[in-house]
């Protein structure tokens, strides 16, 4: 089996109605992990649903999905991510021709077709403060170079990490080598962590613009400084620097 897709749902039945029909024909196996048992009632034929025995973190649910599937590649896709036709094939084809590509992500766009930057730099203390405090009001979204690569890619390009909250192809052998995702992250930063550990193990991270995914991420949560999402992100960053203290001294 070539590609297994894992979708973690926290009660996103409405989003799944749009994304699963687009995703299912592009993969060999599709598993929905329902973090809220019984919250996923209707799925396309051939899609498996596994109820989490108790509420777990996103990363822990991804690990459960990886363990319950068998594809050489695991596509982690969010309920609100809709791959365009041929997107998964483009990701897999690239990975097949680049044997050290451990993580391969698509070009992510908003529902209106505008670019959504998803290839990012590993975090620094300065960058986190710039992005997660009122300092971010000093610049327009995504125009800075502290956290993101600033131009829409036209060719495959390597980067530090790719936004796991949209759609991401991971090589199973890489996941086995680095120990999977870290389920200790409550929400946010787990995608940075898995990419960082992959990088330290010598695996490449690529964005392939021939693969396109529409992502309806609710950007409003990023605008409130003291929202629970901001606090979750800062908590995740604290865990990240405790695991990887060398990032405290990093300038980029």
Name each model feature, range by range.
Residues 82-118:
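Conserved donor NDP-sugar-binding/catalytic core segment of glycosyltransferases
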Residues 12-25:
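Short, well-formed alpha-helical segments that are part of the catalytic scaffolds
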Residues 153-155, 161-179, 184-212:
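A short, conserved alpha-helix in the catalytic core of glycosyltransferases
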Residues 28-38, 48-52:
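Short beta-strand/loop segment that forms part of the nucleotide-sugar
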Residues 123-161:
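Short, flexible, basic/aromatic active-site loop/helix in glycosyltransferases
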Residues 189-252:
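Active-site-adjacent helix/loop segment of glycosyltransferases
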């Amino acid at each position: 089996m070539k590609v297994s897709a894992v979708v973690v749902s926290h009660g996103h039945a409405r989003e799944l109605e749009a994304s699963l029909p687009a995703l299912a024909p592009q993969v060999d196996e599709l598993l929905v992990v329902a973090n809220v048992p019984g919250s996923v009632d209707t799925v396309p034929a051939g899609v498996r649903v596994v109820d989490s025995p108790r509420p777990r973190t996103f990363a822990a649910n991804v690990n459960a999905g990886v363990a319950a599937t068998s594809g050489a590649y695991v596509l982690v896709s969010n309920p609100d991510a809709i791959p365009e036709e041929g997107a998964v094939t483009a990701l897999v084809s690239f990975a097949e021709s680049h044997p050290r590509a451990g993580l391969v992500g698509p070009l992510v766009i908003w529902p209106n077709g505008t670019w959504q930057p998803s290839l990012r730099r590993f975090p620094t203390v300065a960058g986190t403060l710039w992005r997660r405090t009122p300092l971010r009001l000093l610049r327009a979204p995504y125009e800075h170079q502290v956290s993101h690569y600033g131009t829409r890619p036209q060719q495959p390009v390597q980067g530090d990490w790719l936004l796991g909250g949209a759609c991401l192809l991971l090589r199973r052998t890489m996941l086995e080598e680095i120990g999977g995702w870290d389920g200790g992250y409550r929400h946010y930063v787990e995608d940075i962590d898995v990419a960082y550990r992959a990088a330290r193990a010598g695996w490449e991270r690529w964005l392939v613009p021939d693969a396109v995914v529409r992502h309806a991420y609710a950007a409003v949560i990023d605008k409130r400084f003291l929202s629970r999402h901001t606090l979750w992100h800062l908590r995740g960053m604290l865990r990240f620097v405790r695991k990887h203290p060398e990032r405290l001294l990093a300038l980029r």
